[in-house]
Amino acid sequence: MSIDMLIKKIASTSDCRLFEADGLPVIDEKHQLPKDISEFYEQCGGAVLYENADYPIYIVRPAEFELANPIIVGELCEEDISSEWYIVCTDGKGEYLTIDLNDQRKGKCYDSFFDRHGIVGETQVIASSFTDLIQRLLENKGKHWYWLRDDYVSLGDAYDGIEIE
């Protein structure tokens, strides 16, 4: 499904709403936004999915699309791969989903809840791209996080194939 179609689906789904466009996220100069993220923020300024459900999720506003480590850990941790992850969604209660903007892993989305963010073997890949993430979150309809269900087919861990010193 394209970003345009997902935006239309958000707009037409009860308990979901789009925020007014507010420009593109400003990111570190060494990173580039994936095309689907640019397309999304050119049309809207974030969204809330299933606002009144048990598990609402907010696609952050452009100003909140920030490097994750300073927010979640309190420092950048430049030596770790998580230093290139940006906050893309929040539950509104201090838990986050992140997206990797490293060229080799660009677009992969991770479960960055406080108890697993940046922990080898605990940071699940929950979507292969921003588009994939939004589609999965819409299909989940505000129920318990899809990647924590028993029937979830794993996409691996953020640290798979990474040499840890």
Curated annotation (Swiss-Prot):
Principal subcellular localisation of the protein: cytoplasm
Gene Ontology terms: cellular component: cytoplasm
Deleted gene: phenotype: Deletion of the yokI-yokJ operon has no visible growth phenotype, however it is out-competed by wild-type cells.
Conditions for induction: Expressed on rich and minimal solid media likely in early stationary phase; not dependent on DegSU. Not expressed in liquid LB, but only under conditions that promote biofilm formation.
Location(s) in or outside the cell: Cytoplasm
Keywords for this protein: Cytoplasm
Record-linked Pfam families: SMI1_KNR4
Statement: the UniProt record of this protein carries the keyword Cytoplasm: yes
Gene3D superfamilies according to UniProt: SMI1/KNR4-like
Known partners and oligomeric status: Probably interacts with cognate toxin YokI but not with other non-cognate toxins. The interaction inhibits the toxic activity of YokI.
Function of the protein: Immunity component of one of 6 LXG toxin-immunity modules in this strain. They promote kin selection, mediate competition in biofilms, and drive spatial segregation of different strains, indicating that LXG toxins may help avoid warfare between strains in biofilms. Mediates intercellular competition during biofilm formation; disruption of the operon disadvantages the bacteria, but overexpression of the cognate immunity protein restores growth in competition with wild-type. In situ neutralizes the toxic effect of cognate toxin YokI.
Protein name as it appears in the record: Immunity protein YokJ
Organism: Bacillus subtilis (strain 168)
Taxon lineage: Bacteria, Bacillati, Bacillota, Bacilli, Bacillales
Name of the gene encoding the protein in the UniProt record: yokJ
